[in-house]
């Protein structure tokens, strides 16, 4: 709630700084508690939860201080008529949907080890496979999204202002550029994770299985990043109710598919369910965004960025790799980034992510017109 206030008040930098400090403090406090916690799984869980709780309390106190500071010197005034009814009309369905989604997520967490065990794996092996995905693959997969979340925090007040001022042309321009930039960032990152999955997992976890699973999930990163971006833009356009409705639908679909596929196909059923549910969620959210903003769907940018990632990935994988994982990581990462960046500039794909007023061709055309 306090974070939403700072976002609406245009104090995104403060919010970002508090969030970064909270994460650092959470890590530091958890490490301190781990040193004094009793040995075993219970002590480790206590240390992690305790560090998270203390860091969250500190962040909430700082955010409340910013909230009080923002209202200092402002005389209280009466609320507009009907404001309470409007807030209840918005908050009630959001709260109910959140409760339903929480219940569905809990059911999903219970279904996964049960379904893996039903597929023939022992309880220990089932939990180990699930832990590899959630504890090793997903953190690496979602780490680059931190840059995207910072962009989303800046987008929400900008889109809300465009909507309130009825600036349809500006709204369409911002939405179009953000979708193109998200495509470029998502395809680059997904391809990079696919290329570096093996050496990265060896360096971080010393696990070949984690590398195989990371390479399997790497292409899905494009959908995950774009889904987060589209959800953020829908929030800026006051489409929270539709957003929560789509999330609830896909959570229910997730549970149904897990119940049917997990006992029969094991981890493969989980992978299929994860990909299918997120694709459905992204398709519904993107359809809503295009309808609200009036934009027309175009597959040209998506095809171009996909070809860039495939070409750069092929060049990196065909490059002879030296023995050590660190050297392979650096060499193939450099080849991939160089080929992708060069191809994006030569093909003009990178220029499409820049506003028209800032494009070199547009500036040159205006300069010729002035002459």
Protein language model features and the residues they cover:
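Alpha-helical transmembrane segments of multi-pass membrane transport and lipid-handling proteins
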Residues: 172-223, 255-256
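Helix-terminus/linker motif at the lipid-water interface of multi-pass membrane proteins
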Residues: 34-38, 99-144, 161, 201-205
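Alpha-helical transmembrane segments
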Residues: 230-238, 286-300
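Hydrophobic alpha-helical transmembrane segments
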Residues: 17-32, 37-69, 249-253, 267-288, ...
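Membrane-proximal transmembrane or re-entrant/amphipathic helices at the cytosolic face
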Residues: 319-371
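Helix-loop junctions and terminal segments of transmembrane helices
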Residues: 141-166
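Interhelical loop/hinge segments that connect adjacent transmembrane helices in multipass membrane
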Residues: 45, 60-99, 166-169, 291-306, ...
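Membrane-interface junctions at transmembrane-helix termini in multi-pass inner-membrane proteins
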Residues: 1-17, 219-249, 260
């Amino acid at each position: 709630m306090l974070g939403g206030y700072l976002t609406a008040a245009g104090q995104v930098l403060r919010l970002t700084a508090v969030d970064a400090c909270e994460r650092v403090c959470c890590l530091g406090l958890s490490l301190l508690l781990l040193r004094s916690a009793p040995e075993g799984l219970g002590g480790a869980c206590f240390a992690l939860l305790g560090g998270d709780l203390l860091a969250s309390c500190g962040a909430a106190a700082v955010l409340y201080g910013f909230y009080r500071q923002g209202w200092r010197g402002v005389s209280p005034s009466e609320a507009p008529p009907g404001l309470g009814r409007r807030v209840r009309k918005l908050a009630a369905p959001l709260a109910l949907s959140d409760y339903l989604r929480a219940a569905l997520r809990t059911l999903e967490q219970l279904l996964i080890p049960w379904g893996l065990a039903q597929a023939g794996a022992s309880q220990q092996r089932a939990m180990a496979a699930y832990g590899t995905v959630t504890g090793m693959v997903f953190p690496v997969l979602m780490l680059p999204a931190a840059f995207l979340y910072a962009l989303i925090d800046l987008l929400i007040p900008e889109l809300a202002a465009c909507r309130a001022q009825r600036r349809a042309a500006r709204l369409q321009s911002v939405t179009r550029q953000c979708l193109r930039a998200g495509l470029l960032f998502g395809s680059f990152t997904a391809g990079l994770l696919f290329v570096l999955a093996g050496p990265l997992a060896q360096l971080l976890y010393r696990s070949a299985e984690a590398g195989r699973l990371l390479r399997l999930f790497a292409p899905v990163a494009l959908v995950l990043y774009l889904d987060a971006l589209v959800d953020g833009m829908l929030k800026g356009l006051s489409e929270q109710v539709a957003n929560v409705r789509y999330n609830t639908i896909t959570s229910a679909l997730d549970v149904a598919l897990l119940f049917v596929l997990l006992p029969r196909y094991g981890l493969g059923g989980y992978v299929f369910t994860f990909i299918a549910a997120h694709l459905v969620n992204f398709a519904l959210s993107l359809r809503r965004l295009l309808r609200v903003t009036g934009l027309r769907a175009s597959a040209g940018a998506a095809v171009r960025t996909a070809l860039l990632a495939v070409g750069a990935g092929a060049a990196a994988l065909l490059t002879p790799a030296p023995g050590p994982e660190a050297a392979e990581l650096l060499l193939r990462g450099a080849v991939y980034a160089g080929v992708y960046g060069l191809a994006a500039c030569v093909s003009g794909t990178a220029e499409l992510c820049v506003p028209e007023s800032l494009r070199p061709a547009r500036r040159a055309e205006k300069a010729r017109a002035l002459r």
